[in-house]
Amino acid sequence: MSGIVEQTAVPSRVATVSLHTSPLDQPGTGDAGGMNVYVVEVARRMAERGVAVDVFTRATRADLPPVVELAPGVNVRHVPAGPYGRLDKNTLAEHLCPFIFGMLRAEAQNEPDHYDLVHGHYWLSGQAGVVAARRWGVPLVQSMHTMARVKNASLADGDEPEPEARLRGEDQLVRQADRLIANTDDEARQLREHYGARDGQISVIPPGVDLEVFSPGSRRDALARIGLPAGTELLLFVGRVQRLKAPDVLIRAAAALLERDPSLRSRLVVGVVGGLSGGGMREPGLLTDLARSLGVADVVRIEPPQTRERLADYYRAAAVTVVPSYSESFGLVAVESQACGTPVLAARVGGLTTAVADGVSGVLVRGHNPDDYAAELHRMIAEPAWRAKLAMAAPEHAATLGWSRTVDELLDVYRACTAPRALPLAACR
């Protein structure tokens, strides 16, 4: 009987590693995005189920306290590593050693066996996680979120390929992780094909959406709350402004749409909600200059990142949310939009093929030709019955992707990897 109890025991404390971006950061700014949301939502719900979570992240300011309580049972631990300030993500590998030292030093202040498991997010965190997990004698669970070989295979024009150090680091990480978490079946396939991961090493667990915050509501009221008149056709982009996310595709598509139907200009708004990020689109005026050159500056509205509650209003106000990314391991924005009852027009890439039910809750487009996006946008505006059909199905599709399911399935993985401690770590594979 004791063996059965050990096999099903829930770990008491998990060390989560989010080196390059803090869960306290506002999503949509810098390197903060869907991964930040994932770490926060999972940590909160793990704590509600009795699993304490410490999130280790790099300190970006000297005045940050060593520990900040994010929620009951969830602490964010700021680790000094390299100079303060926002650093280019590609330079952070140079500061792995002090970061790892800081993690080990923090753990050494506790009783032995303080952590039952390490969960790394992104390859940099995984590098630190490998060392910490082996030092503490606990399993390493790794979520890649994005992968270098996948990104390099679908670069936007002008984007730079991921560095060789990341390629080698990801190869090493896949070999050493006890369990890999893939967001979708497509990501699991990529882990096998590009990195040689074994089937039994991978667990496919889709991320979720907060269905209490992101829920349907009156479009007219939402338009008023964000300062737009009733009848506005809002084409919405949400995310970091970087080439990978391709906000320029939406602006070019809007120009093609207005060329096709000039009568739309008086009620069309292209909303870009998000902050500047890495990936080659750092010039503050790049999108506004593009809009001006295409003659659509009068309909383009660029807004900073919003709180979750405010963002939900943007989704509700939109006629359609456009996600034209070149690569996505999942596509949280697409799911949030659908949860609010707004259909999605997205690129047929990566996790977006799971996040969007093509022809049911949205439409997937092959490639990144603005004319193809313009054609689909025109249909959604010109055929309200078609858009209404998609909008009605969107919340139903999003409801299958709640965070409770994500955390339940992650807990199953954690249990398998932590019990019994006497077994080899490879047993959780």
Swiss-Prot record:
Name of the top EC class for this enzyme: transferase
GO MF term list: acetylglucosaminyltransferase activity; D-inositol-3-phosphate glycosyltransferase activity; magnesium ion binding
Sequence positions that bind 1D-myo-inositol 3-phosphate: H20, D31, A32, G33, G34, M35, N36, K89, Y122, T146, R166
Binding site for Mg(2+): Y315, R316, A318, T342
EC nos: 2.4.1.250
UniProt GO BP: mycothiol biosynthetic process
UniProt keywords, alphabetically: Glycosyltransferase, Magnesium, Metal-binding, Transferase
InterPro entries for the chain: Glyco_trans_1, Glyco_trans_4-like_N, Glycosyltransferase_grp1, Mycothiol_biosynthesis_MshA
Assigned protein family: Belongs to the glycosyltransferase group 1 family. MshA subfamily.
Role, per record: Catalyzes the transfer of a N-acetyl-glucosamine moiety to 1D-myo-inositol 3-phosphate to produce 1D-myo-inositol 2-acetamido-2-deoxy-glucopyranoside 3-phosphate in the mycothiol biosynthesis pathway.
Protein name: D-inositol 3-phosphate glycosyltransferase
Species this chain originates from: Nocardiopsis dassonvillei (strain ATCC 23218 / DSM 43111 / CIP 107115 / JCM 7437 / KCTC 9190 / NBRC 14626 / NCTC 10488 / NRRL B-5397 / IMRU 509)
